[in-house]
Amino acid sequence: MNPVCVQGGEYSKVRGSHSPYGDAWDYVKNKEGILKFWEDGIKRSVGHHVFPTVGMRGENDSKMLGEDSLISDNVRLLKEIITKQKEMIHTYLEKDEKTVPKLFAVYKEVEDYYFGGGTEEGLRGFEDLDDVTLLLCDDNFGNMRALPEKFERDHKGGFGMYYHLDYHGDPVSYEWVASTPLNRIWEQMTETWEYGVRKLWIVNVGDVKFQEFPLNYFMNLAYDFDTWGSEAPNSTGAYTEKWIKDTFGEYTSEDERREIRDVLEGYLRLNGLRRPESLNDTVYHPAHELECERILTQCEILEKKNESVRQILRSRGKENAYYSMIYFSAAASVNLLKMQLYSGKNHLYANQGKAVANLYGEMTEQFIKRDEELAQEMADFKNGKWAGMELASHIGFTNWNDEDWRYP
């Protein structure tokens, strides 16, 4: 989160040896320049509805004083920074007894500084944060890391949550298609609500394309929690039905909408078991307990339904929304999964010296080719309307990002 109404990346465009903001994103070495940078950011926000963030991180989401610095040193520095920032906010944005909401993001780089560690106290309980909303964060993969304890749930500034449907970072990024099932969102965010996190919900969605459905659900859960939240367990199926009817109801039958639901829930469930970017040919065993065969059966059923729905809608001239929001994601996800499953069979039987390994190797190559064909089809669809959205790397990640990704 970027402090006091200025974007962190903006500093790189205005820094320099002759800049009034100095040439170091470092509060210790360049205190006056950083304060000037923040002050000017607040000044230009006067008259606008803002939710300024207090605090500071190092460059590129790193720790301020380095990985080996003491928690106590960082906490001491953050206390000074937060106090200075609040003074600026009060001076420029809170005139005439007006108050503005303020936010402190307890993201992974600053968690230790908030909660403390060992004998070192953190910012928890710091009086200058009393009227500040504390934004907690999931583990980057849609699971809660920390929630308010009983003694702090009446915190004056309230609590918020930063949730991920898309992530760029360690240990493995996932930025291709939707891979978070609704029931996981429901489980985690209703727990969040029950623990008193009700002031602010933020969702990191990356590109909206391919995330339309889970994003829509997240926003509706936040907006109408009484209908979809804690008092409505097992309601994600009903929500899915409603969304499909709202989106496709004018030109589909009830049976066809049921098929769409099977496709939508099916591919999200499979992607939720193992996100595509972190999938490899050893995840599902090619022989033990018929694990591979059971997954392949699910893939075949889902694939047939997906193709059937597309052909029906195409015959009516109504395939556009289905293709771009569901068909491509489901088809490409299933194809990738089959690619890895058959690659696993190829490697198993090759190690055993069995000739059938060659057959599975050829099948794997067919799925690789199909992956390329699906991407090109998406790029060409509707005269290139969504061209570029198909380019996200998604196969065989060997690092946290797409460097050195590889086909099986």
Model-found features: residue ranges?
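Feature activates predominantly on carbohydrate-active enzymes
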Residues: 1-32, 46, 123-143, 150-181, ...
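C-terminal non-catalytic alpha-helical accessory regions
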Residues: 239-397
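Gly/Pro-rich turn-and-neighbor structural signature
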Residues: 31-156, 285, 289-322, 326, ...
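Substrate-binding cleft of secreted/luminal carbohydrate-active enzymes
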Residues: 181-264, 343
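Short secondary-structure boundary/capping segments
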Residues: 2, 19-23, 68-75, 117-122, ...
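Flexible loop/turn segments at secondary-structure boundaries
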Residues: 5, 11-17, 21, 59-65, ...
